[in-house]
Amino acid sequence: MFQGADSQAGKSGSRSMKPPGGESSDLFGSPEEGISSSKPNRMASNIFGPTEEPKNIPKRTNPPGGKGSGIFDESTPVQTRQRLNPPGGKTSDIFGSPVTATAPLAHPNKPKDHVLLCEGEDSKSDLKAATDSTPRGEQSDKGSSKEVEHAKIPEPTPTVDSHEPRLGPRPRSHNKVLNPPGGKSSLSFY
């Protein structure tokens, strides 16, 4: 006949009170059982100090024989090396050799006209040396050669017709993106 919940109330051991895998499959741990392990808890944090270690286990850096392996004794000459450059300075001392400070490298597709303006006194002295090394016959014919040299050498002005293809595409005067990173869409934004 029909047996309800009243008939199971009298039984002391019911199946619903046991875990599905038996009593040994305690995945999350229960507060009733004490952990009886000689190893420290791996998840324990050592923020507030070192954990207590057993006293009977010898440390590997100090063997029972009394003599060390000598691995850690020779590390002092490496630490006596002095720093030549401050950290984060203009030069990098990663590999141990001093590197002279150089001008930042320009993009390979851009013209290098701005380099003469940025370098400073060195480029000006090079320009003066170049004007002084003109042939002597021209100086006697023209009088003051420096004024004539500056008038004769105009600054290069890039034009669209004289564009070199090795420098990349021709410069554009508008801001329309022709090839966006995500590809073209059917919408056009001007």
UniProtKB/Swiss-Prot annotation:
InterPro entries: JUPITER
Residue ranges, annotated region (Disordered): 1-190
Biased composition (Polar residues): 1-15, 35-44
N-acetylmethionine carried by residues: 1
Modified residues (N6-acetyllysine): 11
Keywords, comma-separated and alphabetical: Acetylation, Cytoplasm, Nucleus, Phosphoprotein
Main location: cytoplasm
Basic and acidic residues composition bias: residue spans: 110-129, 138-153
Gene Ontology CC annotations of this record: cytoplasm; nucleus
Disulfide bridges in this chain: none
UniProt modified residues of type Phosphoserine: 30, 45, 69, 97, 144
Subunit-structure text: Monomer. Dimer. Interacts with TPCN1.
Family recorded in the similarity comment: Belongs to the JUPITER family.
Function of the protein: Nicotinic acid adenine dinucleotide phosphate (NAADP) binding protein required for NAADP-evoked intracellular calcium release. Confers NAADP-sensitivity to the two pore channels (TPCs) complex. Enables NAADP to activate Ca(2+) release from the endoplasmic reticulum through ryanodine receptors.
The protein's name in its UniProt record: Jupiter microtubule associated homolog 2
